[in-house]
């Protein structure tokens, strides 16, 4: 029976393909999933001229990294909270995995001695609830008024940026910088943004590697949904590939 596979590429709550790509990247960078236990990751809000970016990345990050025994710190200005249900899940998972989860309104506190930093903008959950309600009521004037308030509030936090000074607070000043891309780069894509150009350029190659995992994550999701015994199926495919390669080498010898 032919059955289509449904993959969640992103929703209001989570961004599973992105966060699993991030996870594959940090597993590679730190030499194995077992080496992530005890590592500190700072999932922090960062200023962007656009106030309404999705919450799915920070929520997905705290939802997955807390399962790996990591020290997860969620940092944002007051009023930029994520969904409370997601935070509760993160707390329970951190306790179960032997890691930790906490929230702070101090970006420097989050960056202090961090092994990994993930600074990006997102919209306040409470404001998005209001906006959804206004759209449902077709209240265009209410939407305009809300957007004005949100932009004014957003502009108060331009100091929440990933700068060289901020990176110097991390572990040995060499934390791994993550971003789901595209990033709002100060002086490049905007006047003031999430990250300084000097920081972004320093991590350009690792960022592209991070992004490159996503197609494989999506392919793995599809593969898992199509085969009852995915591990055995992969082993069989590997055996067949090895057999083909062996025959090819032998044919060349003749």
Model-identified regions with their sequence ranges:
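Short beta-strands and strand-loop turn motifs
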Residues: 7-9, 40-46, 74-76, 148, ...
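Short, conserved loop/helix-junction motifs that constitute active-site signature segments
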Residues: 35-37, 66, 165-174, 201-202
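A short helix-to-beta-strand connector/capping loop
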Residues: 2-4, 92-102, 173, 202-204
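Adenosine-phosphate binding glycine-rich loop
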Residues: 170-254
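Glycine-rich phosphate/diphosphate-binding loop of Rossmann-like nucleotide-binding domains
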Residues: 27-133, 137-141
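ADP-ribose/adenylate-binding Rossmann-like module
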Residues: 127-191
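Phosphate/diphosphate ligand-binding glycine-rich loop within oxidoreductases
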Residues: 1-28, 185
């Amino acid at each position: 029976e032919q059955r289509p596979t449904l993959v969640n590429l992103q929703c209001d709550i989570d961004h599973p393909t992105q966060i699993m790509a991030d996870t594959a990247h940090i597993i590679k960078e730190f030499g194995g999933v077992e080496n992530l236990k005890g590592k500190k990751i700072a999932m922090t809000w960062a200023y962007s001229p656009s106030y309404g970016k999705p919450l799915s990345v920070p929520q997905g990050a705290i939802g997955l990294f807390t399962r790996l025994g990591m020290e997860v710190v969620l940092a944002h200005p007051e009023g930029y909270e994520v969904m409370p249900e997601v935070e509760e899940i993160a707390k329970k998972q951190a306790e179960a995995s032997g890691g930790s989860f906490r929230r702070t309104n101090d970006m420097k506190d989050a960056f202090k001695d961090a092994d990994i930093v993930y600074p990006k903008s997102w919209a306040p959950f409470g404001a998005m609830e209001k906006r959804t309600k206004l759209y449902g009521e077709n209240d265009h004037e209410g939407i305009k008024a809300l957007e004005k308030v949100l932009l004014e509030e957003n502009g108060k936090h331009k100091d929440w940026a990933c700068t060289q000074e901020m990176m110097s607070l991390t572990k040995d000043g060499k934390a791994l910088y993550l971003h789901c891309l595209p990033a709002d780069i100060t002086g490049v894509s905007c006047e003031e943004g999430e990250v300084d150009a000097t920081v972004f350029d320093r991590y350009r190659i690792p960022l592209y590697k991070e992004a490159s995992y996503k197609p494989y994550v999506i392919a793995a999701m599809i593969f898992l949904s199509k085969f009852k015994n995915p591990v055995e199926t992969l082993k069989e495919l590997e055996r067949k590939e090895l057999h083909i390669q062996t025959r090819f080498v032998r044919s060349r010898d003749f």
